[in-house]
């Protein structure tokens, strides 16, 4: 899963692929799907300092990668370049070291992500997306699918830090892998992709189908999170990592910009407390750039906001005590 958010309305419609008369949003598939391996099945060995990630702070898919990088202590092992929240008119991401929170392309000095994709594949004809996992040794893209990238980081995190490979990632307990995958699947179409299906719907029926599924799933999670601290119990897992970036953007962006306005997340005490609980984990707040998030969506999507007037958004207290420790019997 990846993020592109074209600025020009015509290019936006092509890139987002609104599907004919149905008016339903269809997400573009990720093109680069190799992986890290230790068995020689791919040329990408998990090694210290070998990999670089390209992300946007606005993008919920890229945010997943930054969360795992922080929680597993991979900051010194995997370097990062951050695109501007602004985009070119064709929908491509650009670098801008003068923009707070963004950077230059630290590896190649390229002006944008599109050059990176063409360097990896001269025949690439699409629009480059983020996140990107880049192999410095082979000077190419390994993968641009967020779910697969975070699974690689969780699987090989010890080797990526130069440690014993026997250590299991705390975010991917072996006994919970099947449940983690099932939870990610359950949340993807209704929530992760559901906000986009609502926002980019081109018929009333498509919109109502999307928001109906979205809020139906949120209601289920409100009930679930009244009983469990995290999605699968007492343990923060990859399932939470895949959901959290979408939900923290909800009240700031999706509620108004994508017309997901039956209610706000702050109106759902269990979900809202869950989001604050994770935000307050050491290292998580530093992965959030609210300015990039707000300005990217509301400025870039000119088919939704043609005059690029960016609303001020809600005031949310992410450091308000969440009181969810009692659900797991500990802090």
Walk through the language-model features, giving the residues of each.
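C-terminal alpha-helical interaction module
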Residues: 1-331
């Amino acid at each position: 899963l990846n993020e592109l958010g074209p600025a020009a309305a015509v290019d936006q419609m092509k890139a987002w692929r609104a599907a004919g008369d149905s008016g339903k949003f269809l997400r573009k598939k990720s093109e680069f799907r190799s992986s890290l391996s230790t068995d020689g099945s791919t040329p990408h060995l998990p090694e210290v300092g070998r990999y670089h990630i390209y992300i946007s702070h606005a993008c919920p898919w890229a945010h997943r990668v930054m969360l795992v990088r922080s929680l597993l202590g991979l900051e010194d092992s995997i370097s990062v370049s951050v695109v501007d929240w602004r985009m070119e008119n064709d929908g491509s991401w650009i670098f801008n070291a003068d923009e707070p929170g963004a950077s230059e392309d630290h590896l190649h000095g390229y002006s944008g992500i599109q050059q990176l994709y063409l360097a990896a594949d001269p025949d690439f004809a699409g629009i480059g997306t983020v996140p990107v996992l880049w192999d410095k040794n082979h000077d190419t893209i390994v993968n641009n699918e967020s779910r697969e990238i975070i699974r690689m980081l969780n699987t090989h995190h010890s080797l990526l830090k130069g440690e014993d490979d026997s250590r299991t990632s705390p975010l991917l307990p072996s006994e919970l892998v099947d449940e983690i995958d099932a939870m990610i699947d359950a949340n993807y179409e209704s929530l992760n992709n559901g906000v986009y299906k609502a926002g980019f719907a081109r018929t009333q029926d498509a919109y109502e189908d999307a928001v109906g599924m979205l809020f139906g799933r949120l209601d289920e999670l409100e009930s679930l999170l009244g009983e469990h601290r995290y999605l699968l119990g007492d343990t923060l897992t990859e399932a939470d990592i895949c959901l959290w970036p979408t939900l923290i953007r909800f009240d700031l962006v999706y509620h108004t910009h994508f017309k997901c306005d039956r209610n706000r997340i702050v109106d759902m005490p269990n979900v809202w407390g869950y989001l604050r609980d994770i935000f307050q984990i050491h290292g998580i707040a530093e992965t959030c750039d609210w300015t990039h998030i707000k300005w990217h969506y509301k400025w870039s999507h000119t088919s939704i906001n043609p005059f690029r007037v960016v609303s001020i958004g809600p005031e949310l207290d992410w450091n308000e005590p969440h009181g969810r420790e009692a659900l797991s019997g500990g802090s």
